[in-house]
Curated annotation (Swiss-Prot):
It is found in: Cytoplasm. This is S-adenosylmethionine synthase. GO terms for cellular component: cytoplasm. K(+) binds at E45. It comes from Geobacillus thermodenitrificans (strain NG80-2). SUPFAM superfamilies: S-adenosylmethionine synthetase. Catalyzes the formation of S-adenosylmethionine (AdoMet) from methionine and ATP. The overall synthetic reaction is composed of two sequential steps, AdoMet formation and the subsequent tripolyphosphate hydrolysis which occurs prior to release of AdoMet from the enzyme. ATP binds at H17, D177, G178, K179, R244, F245, D253, R259, K260, A276, K280. Pathway: Amino-acid biosynthesis; S-adenosyl-L-methionine biosynthesis; S-adenosyl-L-methionine from L-methionine: step 1/1.
Length: 404
């Protein structure tokens, strides 16, 4: 590898990974509540360990949902259906410890600071204040069709394929827990040129030989997913590198909601504000503003205004308008970043209520995001992945740039 070339690595995990079990349970509960009560406030955290699921958090709603049933259905759907897997949907204990949202927080969210101070018009009074302070990032680049970095894109597709060959009995000896990792080599212009390394760790039946797992992973998982032109004789493969992965899932490791925030986003390729997504209703800007930031970044790249774009939004609790909007195109912008910020302000309502309305977020759409990434998904229709603003952004940005 020449001195100017570089390697970058991202990882993904399957739906049976302990932390991802928790994300899916939290979002399944959120979806069940939003289906009946779109205005509910939900902050739902899940923890799993051997034989036990604990659901806790703050939920304020007018409806009732059967949390233990949702937990068991989710665990069953993932594939933990037998005690010998170390975790069983029908026999695991389910504990719940649910509170209501703090009235101090609710006060800030229910009526935004600007409205309390009388600074907003009547129609703006409906704007919801941010549920917390914080900063969120959104990112897009033209490395893949879905405008995502290639390492995380391939890692997610490999993880999803692992679950697919297990559930369709192509490889019936696989069990639900698993991880993937992909290292991409970039040339001196920052373009991806080849896959340097692929790591796959998958839980399996104790009687299966390591050599068979290695052969099957290459034939049934890697080959259908990774484009042949990216693989060469120097690509390295590490399949179950410890030699054995029988004990897995919650029996192997405890899991928690919100522990896979880099897997959920851009695989470390872009910055992260630190807030997790799963189990949070859309008044939580950790979630909704991160989705909005991706929506903005993706439309900028789709418009051809930059090859790579990172958007940062920041909020104060109880205040509707973002305290800052920042855009970085890493030297790839076709117009200045000041122009981009202006057209973004003109075309995207980035107040929490504006985001919820723009992306229609008060719907039960979240469980499907809780495994295999929240961004760049081609298998599900997510509103923040649409590029419906690209044309107007391009037109306005180029017009503004002429007047600079």
């Amino acid at each position: 590898m020449s001195a100017k070339r570089r390697l970058f690595t991202s990882e993904s995990v399957t739906e049976g990974h302990p932390d991802k079990i928790c994300d899916q349970i939290s979002d399944a509960i959120l979806d069940a509540i939003l289906e009946k009560d779109p205005n509910a406030r939900v902050a739902c955290e899940t923890s799993v360990t051997t034989g036990l699921v604990l659901v806790s958090g703050e939920i304020t709603t007018s409806t009732y949902v059967d949390i233990p049933r949702i937990v068991r259905d989710t665990v069953r759907e993932i594939g933990y259906t037998r005690a010998k897997f170390g975790f069983d949907a029908d026999t695991c204990a389910v504990l719940t410890a649910i509170d209501e949202q703090s009235p101090d927080i609710a006060m800030g969210v229910d009526q935004a600071l600007e409205a309390r101070e009388g600074q907003m018009t009547d129609e703006e009074i409906e704007a919801i204040g941010a549920g917390d302070q914080g900063l969120m990032f959104g990112f897009a680049c033209n490395e893949t069709e879905e405008l995502m970095p290639l390492p995380i894109s391939l890692a997610h597709r490999l993880s999803r394929r692992l679950a697919e060959v297990r559930k369709t009995d192509v490889l019936p000896y696989l069990r639900p827990d698993g991880k993937t990792q992909v290292t991409i080599e970039y040339d001196e212009n920052g373009k991806p040129v080849r896959v340097d390394t692929i790591v796959i760790s998958t839980q399996h039946h104790p009687e299966i030989e390591h050599d068979q797992i290695e052969r099957d992973m290459k034939e049934h998982v890697i080959k259908p997913i990774v484009p042949a032109e990216l693989l060469d004789e120097n690509t390295k493969y590490f399949i179950n590198p410890t030699g054995r992965f029988v004990i897995g899932g919650p029996q192997g490791d405890a899991g928690l909601t919100g522990r896979k925030i880099i897997v959920d986003t851009y695989g470390g390729y872009a910055r992260h504000g630190g807030g997790a997504f799963s189990g949070k209703d859309p008044t939580k800007v950790d979630r909704s503003a991160a989705y909005a930031a991706r929506y903005v970044a993706k439309n900028i790249v789709a418009a051809g205004l930059a090859d790579k774009c990172e958007v940062q939004l920041a909020y104060a609790i109880g205040v509707a308008r973002p305290v800052s909007i920042s855009i970085d195109t890493f030297g790839t912008g076709k117009v200045s970043e000041d122009v981009l910020i202006e057209v973004v302000r003109n075309n995207f309502d980035l107040r929490p209520a504006g985001i919820i309305k723009m992306l229609d977020l008060r719907r039960p759409i979240y469980k499907q995001t809780a495994a295999y990434g929240h961004f760049g998904r081609t298998d599900v229709d997510l509103p923040w992945e649409r590029t419906d603003k690209a044309a107007v952004l391009k037109e306005q940005a180029l017009a503004l740039a002429k007047n600079e």
